[in-house]
Amino acid sequence: MSSTPVVTPDITGTLPGAVVPLATAGSSDYTPTGVRFDVSIGGVPFMLTAGKDTPYVRQTAPIQKPQFDVSSQAGEQTLDQYWIRSQASWHRGAGVKFYEPGNSTNARLWEPGAELITEHRFESSCGVDVWTRDQATLLYRTALTGASAGLAYVTTGKLADGTDCVFTNEAGVINRRTAAGASTSYTGGTAPLTAIAVAGSKVLAGHAAGIDVGDANGSTMAALWTIASGATVVPYWVKGRIIASIGPSLYSLTLTPGGAIASTNIIHTHQDPSWVWSSVTDGPAAIYAAGYSGASSSIYKFTLQDATTGTLPTLGQAYEVAVMPTGEQVTALRSYLGGYLGLGTNMGVRVALMDTNGNINYGPLVVETAYPVYSVEGHGSFIYAAVQEGIDGLTGVVRVNLGQPLPHEDLRFAYATDAQTHDNGVPSSIAFFGTTDRVVLGVTGKGVYTQSATLLEATGYILSGRIRYKTVEKKAFRLADLRARVPAGTVALSALDENASEVNLITLGSNAADGTSIGLTQPAGNHEYLSFRTTLTCSGDGLTGPTLQSLQVKALPAPKRQRLIQYPLNCEDRETSATGVKFGFKGYAWQRIQAMELAEENNVVLQCQDFTNGETFSATIEQSEFARTAPRAADGSGNFAGTLKVTLRKLA
């Protein structure tokens, strides 16, 4: 162990470096020597000169910055110091984990750190219609109207004798179901049936022996085309003709009875004998057929070519216009609105664009699913997809809004869950009652579910994205404002913490609809983020429900508080300690000032020791200020002297 140098009280010259260390300020401790210093900052020692004009100060570091409101949502930065997050519309759909809205239309107002595509979005929903701007209401409920133990296939609805209806295959029996609830069963068909299709005034049904046909307004089926046993025929009606898939081959047929389907009717046979044609649809310039084999899947187009006047155009050869990522299989196709193509796959839903040449460009997965999507349909400005166990683990429908593309995201659109069966099972097909927007869903082994025209879902919810105000620092969530119209039923608000623990905050009813200034005493403590679930419940008769208008959450930042400590330090070339020991040399004060300024400029983490109270901690220099109070010595020996105020931010 090294010995401590002996220092006599009357030394007036330069002292050894061991007594007055001048190393660069850093993280090392200062080892006391013969001089009893008061403070060491980064290993550089000082004497305190605390007094009335130069006090020693300890204070809490500020945690909020001055700000003014330039947000796209008025009041998002407020004068009462609350951090606010507001949501008054949900029309951009589900799928966000964090709700950090920016400004999607004006880049000048884009909030740093915000995600433009989260504005007016939420994490998930169930049983709620979010597509009307500035409100959310309950959807109409569905009910099982045709129980079936076998395949339940629903084809696109139409008007039959002026009545909205759909055609269903319920365990091998063709039924025509009307929006009013009436049902007509067809006789004479060949079972077991596969898919059915509507061809103008005719209804087509495929089976293992060919294709049957019946009048849309009738009740009997008869053979249209036949095949030898050993295959299954699936018919599609596109561009005024029947396209039928049989194994790896596609056939072009007419509505005129033609007897046995022959090889002359083939328009394309895939070279892979295990190829499965999963869907056929038509676009403005071509017919599209999708299929798969193993991990490979593609979409082919057949362009229309001029034929003899008065006859249908002929079909050109098959061109592969889209190849899916390895492992993703196209299981459903539906063209819509002349330019869009809805793709159902074993991984979810995509949207593609068709050009005037019949080529397509598909986008990313809009909706991701755990099971294949076997049916896609269009209605209004929406594409509907049947999803298995996709609504809180149960089967139903997801709706994609083609009129609401997400900002800065090519071919990604707003989506949300829609009609639900409240049961599980494999959905085989989706349709609508004629010209209405009432969903009809076929579920294999369960039957046909139809959406009511008057009865609302008993309950539904919207789960917000996680609100964290664009920072992972802890927040103290203080207040919530819930606005809703509640003529009947209730609106309840609950909060979920980082562990998904949920606590109810308030329930609004028709007699107690004031949801302003809800105290957020739960979940207890400070949090990085909270999510909020708003649950809507309809009246007992199911005819009236509440309307959600807005939700606003207020919080304050709650990081670990830091301490600012201001030390008034004596800084002279030559000083005298409290015990009378003289120390220093010419340039000693200037070297210590430079050491502090260098540490401040480089934001060095310093080890600080206060020998007056025994405190040791890590810190950075927040501010330094030197005031010279002595003139230069007449003999030129220096006398650089004054008070150095150093403000430290305590880190630990």
Regions inferred by a protein language model and the residue ranges of each:
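Extracellular ectodomain segments of secreted/surface proteins
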Residues: 143-156, 195, 456-475, 554-558, ...
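N-terminal beta-propeller domains
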Residues: 2-185, 200-202, 206-218, 241, ...
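Blade-level signature of beta-propeller repeat domains, shared across WD40, Kelch, NHL, RCC1
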Residues: 425-463
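Beta-propeller fold detector
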Residues: 184-188, 222-227, 261-269, 310-322, ...
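Extracellular/virion structural assembly segments
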Residues: 556-652
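Non-cytosolic beta-sandwich-type ligand-binding/adhesion modules
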Residues: 5-9, 15, 20-24, 28-29, ...
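Repeated scaffold domains used in trafficking and secretory/extracellular systems
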Residues: 147-160, 189-201, 226-240, 269-284, ...
